[in-house]
């Protein structure tokens, strides 16, 4: 009877193996003999009210693992903080913690664009390709500077510039002006450095390719020029994107006002901007200055591109001239072969098995051979002269000269037309006086 009492607990486990059911029955029978009931599960765990299948357990474990993985791989920024005095602090922050501290949204720290300057909640967010920065009225944050070779600029040049010890022109203005100018100056110097590296390489390669001393074109030089041309195209794209980003800011007056962070956070600076120095105009002048610098770089890159295109035209002309020389030589050899074949028919005629009295004379061989070579040479010279006349450049068309009488008549008419108003005016005044 004790076994029948615990039988309903065994029914949900009917899917288990036969050996497991037998072991459970033996345990129940032993417990009944001892006068106490032993639960199927351990005392520390409570048996579930409904049976759990293997699929449910697998899904539960998968969700836990995915959550743990997401928590472990959360994006962490290596942050470098610069304050107004030039003090530098480096630390690490998770992305969620960072945008909560800066009062920004998660989308503001994605940095998806190649070049962008935006404002969010009295913060300036700048990205110039690999350089990511957040500017506030009190400090500057540089994000993810590792493996970018920025240590020299970050820890030696930038702190002194922000503290007012460098060569920036925005020292009397608030902190965000110095930060923006320092970042723009760094990026312009980077573009200028790329151009200064490419320019001598391209000019040296072009000089070697266009040199008239070399009759053939070196393929290795062409490969180097191709690689430098690709690098120049990338540089032109970077300069163009930089100019477009600056131009977008210059076209929007509201954006220029929003870039002046201290103006909206400090009442004293706001009064000073409204009565004395207009910070929006200063920001516009700053951006216009760097737009002109980028425009100068764009012009230099365009000049290099024009040189490459002109050199390419010269190279094609040289290749065409070499090709024409080879074609002309081939044509001359073809005409020579035709001439020899034409007068070689005489030798073919004597090579037939025909009897004639000419074969008995030994001088006839040399006579026929001489006639063959002389005739072939004459025909070849005639063909060459015909080819030369056909390949001569055509003369420019001669303009028909006008007769001298027509020119003199036209000059007289011009003189009369120029003197007619004055003569009429003078005659009228004389008649009026009379």
From Swiss-Prot:
Residues annotated to bind Mg(2+) 3d: 351, 353
Residue span of the annotated presequence: 1-28
Subcellular location field: Mitochondrion inner membrane
A Pfam family this chain is assigned to: MRS2-like
Keyword Mitochondrion attributed: yes
UniProt record, GO biological process: lactate metabolic process; mitochondrial magnesium ion transmembrane transport
Superkingdom in the source lineage: Eukaryota
Stretches in topological domain Mitochondrial intermembrane: 351-361
Modes of activity regulation: May be regulated by calcium ions.
Keywords: Ion transport, Magnesium, Membrane, Metal-binding, Mitochondrion, Mitochondrion inner membrane, Transit peptide, Transmembrane, Transmembrane helix, Transport
Segments carrying motif GMN motif: 351-353
Residue spans crossing the bilayer: 331-350, 362-392
Positions of Mg(2+) 1 binding: 234, 237-238, 303
Binding-site residues for Mg(2+) 2, renumbered to this chain: 320
Gene Ontology cellular component list: mitochondrial inner membrane; mitochondrion
Membrane topology of this protein: Multi-pass membrane protein
Alphabetical list of Gene3D superfamilies matching this protein: 2.40.128.330, Magnesium transport protein CorA, transmembrane region
Signal peptide: none
Principal place of residence: mitochondrion
Record remark: domains: The GMN motif acts as an ion selectivity filter.
Family according to the record: Belongs to the CorA metal ion transporter (MIT) (TC 1.A.35) family.
Complexes and interactors: Homopentamer.
Function of the protein: Magnesium transporter that mediates the influx of magnesium into the mitochondrial matrix and regulates magnesium metabolism. Also permeable to calcium, sodium and potassium ions. Required for normal expression of the mitochondrial respiratory complex I subunits. May play a role in maintaining the inner mitochondrial membrane potential.
The protein's name: Magnesium transporter MRS2 homolog, mitochondrial
Organism: Rattus norvegicus (Rat)
């Amino acid at each position: 009877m004790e076994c029948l009492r615990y039988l309903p607990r065994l029914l949900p486990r009917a899917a288990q193996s036969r050996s497991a059911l037998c072991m459970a029955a033996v345990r129940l029978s032993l417990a009944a003999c001892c006068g106490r009931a032993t639960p199927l599960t351990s005392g520390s765990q409570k048996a579930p009210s409904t049976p759990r299948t293997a699929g449910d357990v697998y899904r539960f474990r998968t969700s836990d693992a995915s959550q743990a993985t997401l928590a472990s791989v959360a994006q962490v920024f290596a942050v470098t903080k610069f304050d107004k005095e030039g003090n530098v602090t480096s630390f690490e922050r998770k992305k969620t913690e960072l945008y909560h501290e800066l009062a920004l949204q998660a989308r503001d720290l994605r940095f998806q664009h190649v070049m962008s300057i935006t404002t969010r909640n009295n913060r300036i967010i700048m990205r110039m390709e690999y350089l990511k920065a957040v500017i506030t009225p009190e400090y500057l944050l540089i994000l993810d500077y590792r493996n970018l070779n920025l240590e020299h600029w970050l820890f030696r040049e930038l702190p002194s510039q922000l503290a007012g010890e460098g060569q920036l022109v925005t020292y009397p203005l608030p902190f965000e002006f110095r930060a923006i100018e320092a970042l723009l100056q760094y990026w312009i110097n980077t573009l200028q450095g790329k151009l200064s590296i490419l320019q001598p390489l391209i000019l040296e390669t072009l000089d070697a390719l266009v040199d008239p001393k070399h009759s053939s074109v070196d393929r290795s030089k062409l490969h180097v020029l191709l690689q430098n041309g690709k690098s120049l195209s990338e540089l032109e794209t970077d300069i163009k994107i930089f100019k477009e980003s600056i131009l977008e800011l210059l076209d929007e007056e509201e954006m220029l006002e929003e870039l002046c962070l201290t103006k909206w956070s400090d009442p004293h600076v706001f009064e000073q901007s409204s009565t004395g120095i207009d910070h929006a105009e200063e920001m516009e002048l700053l951006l216009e200055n760097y737009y002109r610098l980028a425009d100068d770089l764009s012009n230099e890159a365009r000049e290099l591109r024009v040189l490459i295109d002109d050199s390419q035209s010269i190279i094609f002309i040289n290749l065409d001239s070499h090709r024409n020389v080879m074609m002309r030589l081939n044509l001359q050899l073809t005409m020579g072969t035709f001439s020899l074949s034409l007068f070689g028919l005489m030798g073919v005629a004597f090579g037939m098995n025909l009897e004639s009295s000419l074969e008995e004379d030994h001088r006839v061989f040399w006579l026929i051979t001489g006639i063959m070579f002389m005739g072939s040479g004459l025909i070849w010279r005639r063909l060459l002269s015909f080819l030369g006349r056909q390949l001569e450049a055509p003369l420019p068309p001669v303009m028909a000269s006008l007769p001298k009488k027509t020119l003199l008549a036209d000059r007289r008419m011009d003189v009369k037309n120029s003197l007619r108003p004055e003569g009429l005016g003078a005659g009228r005044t004389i008649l009026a006086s009379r």
